[in-house]
Design a protein with these regions (language model features):
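Charged, low-complexity intrinsically disordered terminal segments
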Residues: 5, 24, 28-444
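Bacterial N-terminal signal peptides that target proteins for export
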Residues: 5-16
Length: 444
């Protein structure tokens, strides 16, 4: 009888512990679902709030990084080519596409020369990204590149049934050299980042060079993509910081910041099935934690409801929200949706500038002069919910100021979407197209 009582007592205690754990779990989830995790009244600056919120999302900032902005195609390719020419060990490239033009051919010549020296050169390109540009790499080009020592492969080849390959495209742009220098941002490999195009004029975009411990994160991202495509696991071959001798790279652009080698950075990587919410949660927290000013440039501002609400909520709590979009665009219908959204956001109190001289394909956000991001992510449903994307989040006032200065300069080449301007600027037919396009925004 006593044993039965003891067993009953133990059972009751176990049930009590389990119930307590369940209550704590539910309370924790309810707290996390409430939006910004730290009350604004806490007095913490927005960059501290962002770091706390992202940590709860599983994103951790590393210290000791150095970021250099590359604000033009010429800057990007000059810097990238100079670094690759000095590679000693490995060059890994992951792009949405390599356009079959002069800048790509120059890149491949440099890579082939490094391969001849014994440097391991691996490259990935997205099948849809390649086929959707007007100068794709053909099979004969891929064969020739492999014969020259460049180990290049296609991410997710498009095969029947084609509908299975619409989503989950690799839109990232990553280069890692010797495991010590990385490049990421919004630019693929194409002449038009330097020359522009007849259709849109100058093609503006943003890239950056990264040095420091966060390079390892980009290297790991490449390794996972490489294994997915080729089946080869190369993640243990000593391609990380500290696993190879420390090399010097000369002739690269200086970042002009007095915080060099002391920057806090986090890689925000969206992968279906692994981290599907990463980028949209970053943007949500970046906007929701703002206390003073948000400056945002994005080419395809078709938005999802969560980000749209975050922007209008920011205005309601007194944050100045400034958004820049481009008047020219490289695709149909999407810009109609963008301009429709801009009109709606302007009515809610956002300040909108429309950039006229060319296509501003830049994807950046700057908040409170304290933090920013540079990356591949468009603020559309495809980037935020479907594709592989990567952004570098940077907690640094110097880099944020450089991007803010660019924003202010570009205002001079933009017109302000004041009250009534939308109806003067867009014809009734264009406004109807915008309304219709916004209905399709989950698919744009």
């Amino acid at each position: 009888m006593s044993m039965k009582k003891d067993m009953k007592s133990i059972h009751e205690k176990m049930m009590a512990v389990i119930l307590l754990m369940l209550l704590l779990t539910v309370a924790s989830q309810a707290h996390a679902a409430g939006g910004t995790d730290v009350d604004d009244d806490s007095g913490l600056p927005s960059d501290s709030l962002l770091a706390i919120d992202l940590r709860r999302e599983g994103e951790v900032f590393t210290a000791g990084n150095n970021v250099t902005l590359l604000m033009t195609g010429q800057q990007k390719f000059d810097d990238l080519f100079a670094a690759i020419r000095q590679a000693r060990h490995s060059v890994h490239l992951e792009y949405f596409n390599f356009r079959n033009d002069s800048i790509a051919m120059l890149l491949f010549d440099i890579l082939a020369a490094k391969a001849a020296e014994g440097v391991k050169v691996r490259a990935l390109y997205d099948a849809f990204g390649n086929s959707s540009n007007n100068q794709p790499l053909r099979r004969k080009h891929i064969r020739e590149l492999r014969e020259r020592g460049i180990d290049i492969h296609e991410f997710d080849p498009i095969r029947f049934p084609w509908i299975n390959h619409i989503f989950g495209r690799d839109h990232r742009k990553i280069v890692v050299i010797d495991g010590q220098i990385a490049y990421t941002g919004g630019m693929n490999v194409a002449d038009y980042y330097i020359t522009g195009t007849p259709a849109v004029g100058a093609w503006r975009d943003m890239h950056c060079r990264l040095e420091g411990p966060e390079v390892d994160t980009l290297q790991k991202i490449f390794f996972r993509a490489w294994k997915k495509v080729t089946g080869e696991d190369i993640g243990t071959e000593g391609y990380f910081n500290g696993k190879t001798p420390r090399y010097e790279y000369n002739g690269l652009k200086e970042n002009g910041a007095d915080t060099a080698d002391r920057m806090l950075c986090a890689t925000i990587n969206r992968e279906p099935h692994r981290s599907p919410k990463a980028v949209r949660q970053f943007y949500y927290h970046a906007i929701s934690d703002a206390k003073d000013t948000i400056r945002l440039i994005n080419p395809y501002l078709t938005l999802i409801p969560k980000i749209r609400r975050a922007l209008t909520d920011a205005v309601e709590r007194g944050v100045t929200v400034q958004i820049m979009v481009a008047e020219p665009s490289d695709i149909p219908l999407t810009p109609d949706c963008v301009f429709y959204n801009c009109n709606k956001l302007q009515k809610k109190g956002c300040q909108i500038w429309v950039y006229k001289p060319g296509f501003h394909h830049t994807k950046v956000i700057m908040v409170d002069g304290r933090y920013c991001t540079v990356g591949s992510t468009n603020l559309d449903a495809r980037s935020l919910k479907c594709d592989y994307e990567v952004n570098l989040a940077i907690l640094d006032k110097n880099i944020t100021r450089q991007l803010t200065d660019m924003f202010e300069r570009d205002k001079k080449d933009s017109f302000y979407l004041a009250d009534g301007v939308y109806k003067q600027w867009r014809t009734p037919w264009q406004r109807f197209r915008g309304w219709f396009a916004h209905l399709l925004s989950p698919f744009l």
